[in-house]
Amino acid sequence: MLRGIDISNWQAGLDADSAFPNVDFVICKATEGVGFVDGYCDGWVQWCRRNGKPWGFYHFANSNDPVKEAVHFIDNTSNYFGEGVPVLDWEGDQGIDWVNEFVRVVHDQTGIWPWIYANPWRFNQGGVEQNCMRWIASYPDVLNPGLDYDPGEPPETDGLVGCWQYASDGRVPGYAGNLDVNIFFGSVGAWQAYAGVPSSGQTDKPTGQSVLENDRFRVTIQEK
């Protein structure tokens, strides 16, 4: 089990040298819509690369054509695939067909299925691409939890809950403000598998690999 944060230009004052050593992983906003690129993303990604920190990168969905948004995401992060975990941040009025089109374009062009971040109810509508791991946002009633907080059981969805954002006002040493804090129910090896990093002795993504982290959750990666 890993604990980490997701950040964007809204945390422009965050100093990686102060905060990142205190977390297990970092997910950075990379793009939005068809024209926005987060100027802080690459600096944070390079810190993670230099220091061996698991990391991810996400696209914030707008309501443009999903193919154009996917291409914008890929074009501006092409050298991230195979190292970090790609994510679609689904918070707007996009329908399920929009989401599925986006993630399938990403997979078709990169060979990697992105995670999908959303509230549980969005997944529970049914029909969301099952190859994509679910990163859910659901907040227990607690003020300013840290990375050591136990939020209990995550809400159920229609698929695998691999990551849970359990607060938007979390606190992490090295940063004075609120942060999104998360639990990943897997190991560093599982994280790398989602990113498409080849494991030792393998030339491609693992096939049929299961990683059991505790008595409640199992992360399974199956090549399609």
Residue ranges and their predicted role:
Residues F60, E91, N119-W121, Y139:
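Histidine- and/or cysteine-centered catalytic micro-motif in compact active-site loops
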Residues M1-S18, E129-K205:
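Functionally critical loop-and-helix segments that line ligand-binding/catalytic clefts
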Residues G35, N64, F123, L143, ...:
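Flexible, glycine-rich phosphate/dinucleotide-binding loops
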Residues G111-N124:
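Aromatic-lined carbohydrate-recognition surfaces of secreted/lumenal glycan-active proteins
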Residues M1-I112, N131:
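Substrate-binding cleft of extracellular glycoside hydrolase catalytic domains
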Residues D204-K224:
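Short, low-complexity, charged amphipathic interaction modules
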Residues W44, D75-T77, W121-Q125, N144-P154:
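Intrinsically disordered, low-complexity boundary segments flanking structured domains
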